Amino acid sequence: MTILTHTLGFPRVGLRRELKKAQESYWAGNSTREALLAVGRELRARHWEQQKQAGIDLLPVGDFAWYDHVLTTSLLLGNVPARHQNNDGSVDIDTLFRIGRGRAPTGEPAAAAEMTKWFNTNYHYIVPEFSKGQQFRLTWTQLLEEVDEALALGHKIKPVLLGPVTYLWLGKVKGEPFDRLTLLKDILPVYQHVLAELAKRGVEWVQIDEPALVLELPQAWLDAFKPAYDALAGQVKLLLTTYFEGVTPNLDTIIALPVQGLHVDLIHGKDDVAELHQRLPVDWLLSAGLINGRNVWRADLTEKYAQINAIVGKRALWVASSCSLLHSPIDLSVETRLDTEVKSWFAFALQKCGELALLRDALNSGETAALEEWSAPIQARRHSRRVHNAAVEKRLAAITAQASQRENPYEVRAEAQRARFKLPAWPTTTIGSFPQTTEIRGLRLDFKKGNLDANNYRTGIAEHIKQAIIEQERLGLDVLVHGEAERNDMVEYFGEHLDGFVFTQNGWVQSYGSRCVKPPVVIGDISRPAPITVEWAKYAQSLTDKPVKGMLTGPVTILCWSFPREDVTRETIAKQIALALRDEVADLEAAGIGIIQIDEPALREGLPLRRSDWDAYLEWGVEAFRINAAVAKDETQIHTHMCYCEFNDIMDSIAALDADVITIETSRSDMELLESFEAFDYPNEIGPGVYDIHSPNVPSVEWIEALLKKAAQRIPAQRLWVNPDCGLKTRGWPETRAALANMVKAAHNLRQAK
């Protein structure tokens, strides 16, 4: 039985972010739909060929998406919200973009669909909307067209489909409440149709993704898998695909299904290979996810070989990435600035394909010399001086309970803060960043390339900060921000100023739609060699009598949005970051900054996928935030910001952060997230986001007032702040001014209505 290689998916955006540039050009009206489609075809062809050349035997098809693969599945099933539909009922790429971002070059703008985190990753998906009595039909044939493309190029392929049960699990009911699982019988005929079309094309295997099978699902959802897969069986071979956790707790459900193979994530799960082999039906193929699809570290292939070799020859076996390589940068070979030693520790998507090929060849032949050679650098790293800092380890060991306690409880602090700031009712603010204009990006790029000296760079940044303050004062905002002109990314910026991180030139990964991020890599112990944000915050505060917030990214978010070390726990990394940023809080306070925002949008996304594992994570995650913040005096107001969150099940931990003010994303969910705070009787102040910054649509004054009145039905008005959902970095100035002007006007109207 020859072992084969495959990946669960490949990055979509292109090495130079070609897809992002094509999308944004099309959205801006600067290029045609045909030009956009051509870029997609070119990228798919390139990526298939690159994977093939790197040693992948079965290429994934259907992993490409114009915005998000869950949204692609919604269109496949004809699940288009009424507000986004074309007048003639047709579905096209602009339909997709209207759902994802609220507008497109054609059609009427409408509120974008909700967006949330894809399991516990930093990728976002567009949440499917379901209504009672909804009908489904095959309306979007992108998958079939891409299969035809790949077959025409002569590739051996494995189409990828998001499975029906997980698709329903990921969605939300809109309108009259009902059990969305009852729609399963209605979507299965579309899946049957698609599988029949794939069978007609000679497809042998289909990867059908059911990552919900790693969760602690309600019994009714577990019971739904058997009838669903009974309906789908028989047309092609199905590789039931799971990732991000192990499957052992749900293995009884899985082995009863009429599928021909199972993919398991052997990186993030705790499944035992021998037990899986023993319990799976003898004729099933096992796809072993041995190469980490979510990190950038070179694998110790000698360990991987030892992990799987015992079952070689005993059942059909493939070796694969743990999950889609969507979460990894594309190609390490173009990184020319990385230190040679550090570069030898890494592997990006194409190198991970090569790792799979090396592992396949060794498992098929029994020859391991190539694995030992490949693994030598990562083994040598364990003893590198770049990794360990005795002073950091000593400080971490000395943390006491007192380090995470503010001097007094919120009620006492709030009095001191009211006396200091004297803010009006319904105080207005923004979340931190202002539009990153072409001029700002060009300034940073010229400085980075050495085309601009430090003095001229600083003069330019100072001018943009000054303009941001002027804009906010004109708008009448109450608490200002400096606008973050000097920051490329909220995590990358801090990583650049902390020891223990390294950065790539082209290590882009998709976050959502056209948004890409370049996560820093944690390679060693973390410390702060010098103040990071103090100079610009102090300068901004000197320009105005209104309070200017100091802006920090919190320790858990920096951890979650970086590629972490694999040789220490996530708790250790988070607390090292917290100690470094604790010093930053103290320095900001000493510089006269009275309001300091510590963003933790990733706190919830970092949750383990199984609830039984949550408590331990939340305990150290909350402690890390408090270590970061607790150095502040009573009169210093600590804000935190969170987005894409369901808060119901972690309200105890949100309250335990003990932030004086929390700002949250609520506009896309029509303030329903505030139910959690109301039910919990959350004691501190809250700023529910009143408009969606991910959409270019400008909210009306009436819309914002209505949302705020809805918020005031749940939270006492004296504890409410008024702010957008998130930072304004990706928006343009005209829409930013218009939206903020309406927001300020709505707040003024509510003050006068008292």
Swiss-Prot record:
Zn(2+) binds at H641, C643, E665, C726. This is 5-methyltetrahydropteroyltriglutamate--homocysteine methyltransferase. HAMAP family: Meth_synth (MF_00172). It comes from Salmonella enteritidis PT4 (strain P125109). L-homocysteine binds at I431, G432, S433, E484, D599. The lineage of its organism: Bacteria, Pseudomonadati, Pseudomonadota, Gammaproteobacteria, Enterobacterales. The gene is metE. It catalyses: 5-methyltetrahydropteroyltri-L-glutamate + L-homocysteine = tetrahydropteroyltri-L-glutamate + L-methionine. SUPFAM superfamilies: UROD/MetE-like (SSF51726). Catalyzes the transfer of a methyl group from 5-methyltetrahydrofolate to homocysteine resulting in methionine formation. Pathway: Amino-acid biosynthesis; L-methionine biosynthesis via de novo pathway; L-methionine from L-homocysteine (MetE route): step 1/1.
